[in-house]
Amino acid sequence: MDTVSLPQLPATVLVTIAKLVAPADLVSLCDSHPQLVFLRLYLPEFQDIPVGSFRKYGPSDGHFCPELYFTSPVVHQRVGSITLTFRWKDQGFGNRKGMLWIELVREGQLIATSKDDFPTLAPHQEETQEIVIRNHPVVDLIRKGDTINFMRNVGGGGGHSLSVQEFNAKLELYKY
């Protein structure tokens, strides 16, 4: 039996394979041979990361007490923008300290953060937010293999809480 390399397969077979494999595997396949680059057309344009909801109470001491909310799956494509949508509010009175932001992480090292550029504090009354991040280092510097940390600060000092409902992150992905 003769051996056939992937680039020698008919385009219809390669397209079928591209439609069936996970995006991370398709990126690896495309990177494996110059004649397979056309299969990038079958990469997704968006990646939704639905997370859900939480209600968190802050510690009795401290003011800024950042913590990891969750980490994204490993990114396999370049990213054009990140859109965060959610409903949120704090405890409803007193000082406002609740915050959400993202951090770009590569091999365990912080590369960029959006904390100082999107310093919105949670309101006393529930609000719906849509934050679109583009042309910012947390997006522009993303490379294959990176992760995105989604961070939160409830705020310390007693009585602080942060409630986030229906949190979703949507990554706009580049195919090339």
Q: Which ranges hold each PLM region?
A:
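Extracellular and analogous surface-interaction loops
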Residues: L68-R78, H136-I142, Y176
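Exposed low-complexity, polar/acidic, P/S/T/G-rich flexible segments that act as propeptides
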Residues: T83-L84, G98-E103, R143, T147-Y176
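Terminal beta-strand-rich extracellular "head" domains
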Residues: R96-I133
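Conserved beta-strand elements of beta-rich interaction domains across eukaryotes
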Residues: P34-L36, K89, E107-Q109, G155-G156, ...
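Glycine-centered loop/turn motifs
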Residues: H124-T128, L141-T147
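Solvent-exposed, flexible loop/coil segments flanking beta-strands in beta-rich domains
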Residues: V37-M99
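Signal that preferentially marks extracellular ectodomain short beta-strand elements
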Residues: E130-D140, G156-G157
